[in-house]
């Protein structure tokens, strides 16, 4: 058994977190999680039933958060410190389930800590407003004060595979910062980073009812997560087709959709070609090319196209790749065979 597989077993990351409770798989309802590079089975996660999904929303909806701004900032700051303490464990977990090289995984773990710190700072900003009422001849000399309240319902969050913990952090941290409750479904391909992140937040003092992590087959549980009567907001990062499906199913619920990009690198005739070629290579290969901000098109002025192309080819040949666990490699693998064929 690999060290990561043992870490998963030791921390019971093969169980969902429903209101903080560890919920394992029922009979014949487990999803295998494979290391994309070695095809090693590093563990399983439950294939949630509709009853388990409904339980998560019921627990979240029944809980009424009472955390002060000070409380929320303290939780996020402590979680940031815990991420730093466990940074190497997190990086190896990210790398093993996603195939990202360890360099990229270490960077991602550091970014998670950053986002926690940013969230803690935002919590302390007063988001109330004051409006004067004597602005017209009908007005009176008085003022209206406003303050923001948490949603009445629950947030559904659905995250992709390409940044197993950082994408999760960008959903969960704003929810915690605003005293909301969330049911999160990470990609079934990379579930462990999300579950471990939830555990770190619980350890930092987050009431477990404020965050549940559900794993499962989207074909079985996605509609329930989109249409459950307790859902007030849906936030999704992923592909355009699924985003359109969510928008169609969500009805009058609030939705936040991040649906990829179509990012060009534009190189003009007076560009610094050394810098431009660096950006082209890094933008194409960092994170195994699996980023919404990855370079997808290069528009190069004809007068510098040949020289630019030579530089890109030269730097591509120097880009090291292979075993994601090798610290000398700059690129690991993509998430699965289907992704590799898509790239080809």
What are these regions (language model features)?
Residues 39, 72, 94, 116, ...:
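Residue-level signal for inorganic ion chemistry
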Residues 241-344:
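ALDH superfamily catalytic-core signature
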Residues 78, 82, 86-89, 196, ...:
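Generic non-transmembrane alpha-helical segments
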Residues 57, 73-80, 91, 113, ...:
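Hydrophobic face of alpha-helices
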Residues 93-100, 131-138, 326-332:
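Short linear capping/connector segments at secondary-structure termini
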Residues 42-127:
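Glycine-rich loop-to-alpha-helix module at the N-terminal edge of alpha/beta enzyme cores
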């Amino acid at each position: 058994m690999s060290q990561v597989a043992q870490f998963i077993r030791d921390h019971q990351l093969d169980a969902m977190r429903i209101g903080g409770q560890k919920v394992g798989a029922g009979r014949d309802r487990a999803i295998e999680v494979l290391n994309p590079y070695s095809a090693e089975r590093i563990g399983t996660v439950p294939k949630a039933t509709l009853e388990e999904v409904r339980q998560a929303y019921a627990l979240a909806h029944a809980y009424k958060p009472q955390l002060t701004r000070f409380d929320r900032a303290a939780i996020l700051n402590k979680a940031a410190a815990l991420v730093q303490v466990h940074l190497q464990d997190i990086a190896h977990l990210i790398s093993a389930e996603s195939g990202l090289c360890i360099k990229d995984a270490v960077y991602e773990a550091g970014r998670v800590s950053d986002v926690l710190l940013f969230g803690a700072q935002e919590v302390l900003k007063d988001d109330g407003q004051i409006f004067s009422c004597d602005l017209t001849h009908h007005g009176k000399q008085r003022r209206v004060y406003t303050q923001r309240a948490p949603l009445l319902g629950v947030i559904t969050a659905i995250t992709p595979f390409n940044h197993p913990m950082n994408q999760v952090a960008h959903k969960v941290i704003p929810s915690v910062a605003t005293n909301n409750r969330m049911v999160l479904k990470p990609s079934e391909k990379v579930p462990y980073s999300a579950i471990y992140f939830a555990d770190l937040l619980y350890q930092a003092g987050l009431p477990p009812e404020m965050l549940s992590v559900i794993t499962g087959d989207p074909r079985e549980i996605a509609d329930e997560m989109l249409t459950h009567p307790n859902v007030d907001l849906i936030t999704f990062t992923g592909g355009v087709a699924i985003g359109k499906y969510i928008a169609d199913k969500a009805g009058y619920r609030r939705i936040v959709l991040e649906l990829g990009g179509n990012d060009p690198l534009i190189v003009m005739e007076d560009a610094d070609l050394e810098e431009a070629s660096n950006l082209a290579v890094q933008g194409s290969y960092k994170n195994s090319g699996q980023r919404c901000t990855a370079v997808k098109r290069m528009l190069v002025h004809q007068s510098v196209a040949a020289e630019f192309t030579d530089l890109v080819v030269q730097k591509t040949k120097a880009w090291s790749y292979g075993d994601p666990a090798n610290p000398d490699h700059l690129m690991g693998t993509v998430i699965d065979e289907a992704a590799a064929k898509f790239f080809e």
